From Swiss-Prot:
GO terms for biological process: translation. This is Large ribosomal subunit protein bL35. InterPro entries: Ribosomal_bL35, Ribosomal_bL35-like, Ribosomal_bL35_CS, Ribosomal_bL35_sf. It holds the Pfam family Ribosomal_L35p. One of its GO terms (cellular component) is cytosolic large ribosomal subunit. Residues 24-43 have a biased composition (Basic residues). Residues 24-44 are annotated as: Disordered. One of its GO terms (molecular function) is structural constituent of ribosome. It comes from Dictyoglomus thermophilum (strain ATCC 35947 / DSM 3960 / H-6-12). Belongs to the bacterial ribosomal protein bL35 family. Keywords: Ribonucleoprotein, Ribosomal protein.
Length: 66
């Protein structure tokens, strides 16, 4: 059987923790930041965990990271 390829686009966007959680960056921190509050910008810094319904899709794109 041939090797499975990792989707490089997914590898750049997701990080797998030691416990197996898949984290992603939150949207909304690129531009138009002056109208957003400090608290909101701080909350956007915290990585989010992907939803359970999307987990299998990401796992297929990252075969060797889980």
């Amino acid at each position: 059987m041939s090797k499975l390829k990792t989707r490089s686009s997914a590898a750049k966007r997701f990080k797998v923790t030691a416990t197996g959680k898949i984290l992603h960056k939150k949207a909304g921190k690129r531009h138009n930041l002056s109208k957003k509050s400090k608290a909101r910008k701080r909350r956007l810094d915290i990585p989010g965990e992907i939803k359970s319904v999307d987990r299998w899709k990401v796992e297929r794109m990252l075969p060797y990271n889980l």
